[in-house]
Amino acid sequence: MSIAQLFNQSWVEKSKYVPVRLSDEERKILSLLEAALEVIDYTGHVDIISYTTRTKLMVKYLNEMCSIVMGLVTAMDIKAGRDLLIGRDHKSNARFFQTVFEIGRRYKIMNPEKMRATYGAVMYMCQDSLIPDVRSQLGFDFVSPIKTVYNVLEKHKLLGLLEEKQLLNNLLKQSDPQSNANAKAELLKEREEASETLLKKYNPGKDEKLQKVLTDCFASLADHEAFLLANRNPVEKMRAYLHKFFNPHDTKNGSLKIGYMTGAKLNHDHKTQFFYVDQSLVFWSCMMDQMFLLWLESDASLLDKHSRYFISDTGQGLNRVQLCPLVRSTVTRILSSVQKQQEIPWMGSSVIHLGDRDVPNALMFIDKYRQVPHILAPLVKVLQQLEFLRDPYLVQYIENEYGSVNGLQKTILLDFFRHGFNGQGSDGGSCIDGRLTSAWNWTNEITKKKYYRILLMSGFLNFEGI
């Protein structure tokens, strides 16, 4: 599959990995789950090196989690709590608990910046509930399939809607943040007309429940497109800056050369480093485009009944190490597509660390690539804002120090492209995940940069995605 095919999948294919937006009732359940997760430190109790069986610990704390959730439900809605307590045991409420955890998993996929401290516990609880001995003692597990747009439309026999390519394109087209008011108004009009046409065609009887199903699916697909705009565009813009300010065959605008003498783990001349950075950015862009698919596959890998994990000290504390062939297959396919599109040979290693000490499991993998927009979006935003500075004193300071705003932009980019891609991220140096770790390590050094104060005055906050 080519890069163009990756970026231009049909709505039928996209809908298979786009989760459905949470309803108001589901958001209430989510708040209960998050509250319960704040009370119990599951991994702290269970993920330990022990000479005794961990099964008893798992069963104990999974039962405790169920009890906490039921208690919170009763406190919020006594009638709903009473209905749950009628069954007396947790097994009789298995479907409810599966729904609670599915809502948490689905919400995280659609909102990667949320549940940072608790999502791991959600996945590990679900993972442990699938262990045969644990499931046997509990009487059930916490896992149910993620609700996607495709599943919902299939259930209501509305899959034909996904073939309405032109109408869906008009409905889900995203506005450019730089576009003017007239363009935004025109886009809004197109969306309204497309929505009205689709609703008339697929809900001619104006059934309220069906109307809600359709509007929820539209909103969920729109969320996916908005995610692409917010997460893939910064990568594309950073790549555009690379080509604007630097030439692989000329160093007059600054040399990207790195070597062991400068603290790098790689030894690249200017041309090699240019293409090393460029290829890395192309790969990241493709990864962002397929992020929802990767989230679902990471979820499936972690909850694979046939793939057991083991606890190991990976050098970053105790972690669950688990093979994830499903995710590896997709990443390999994306990498292969990128490599085939390159005019020159692939620079650096093609090793993908998954299920080893560098990237122990699918959860660690997906969390790692979640950082891409956190690194690039703030940088791109500042680089753009520098072009529209209105403070004459700040502009004067920049001109005195760097010659011009353009000179400052080039300084920042030169620093990032050299030291953010210097191979310090992993033992492999230039391996696929090591490139991203190198960039993240560079962000940790940002406060030591000479230009850091100017970044702050230009609107920069942090690289935390907040």
Curated annotation (Swiss-Prot):
Locations listed in the record: Cytoplasm; Nucleus
Name of the protein described by the UniProt record: UPF0652 protein C16A11.03c
Phylogenetic placement of the source organism: Eukaryota, Fungi, Dikarya, Ascomycota, Taphrinomycotina
Family membership: Belongs to the UPF0652 family.
Annotated Pfam families: DUF2009 (PF09418)
Source organism (scientific name): Schizosaccharomyces pombe (strain 972 / ATCC 24843)
Keywords: Cytoplasm, Nucleus
Main location (coarse class): cytoplasm
Recorded superkingdom: Eukaryota
One GO cellular component term: nucleus
InterPro entries cross-referenced by the UniProt entry: DUF2009
PANTHER family: UPF0652 PROTEIN C16A11.03C, UPF0652 PROTEIN C16A11.03C-RELATED
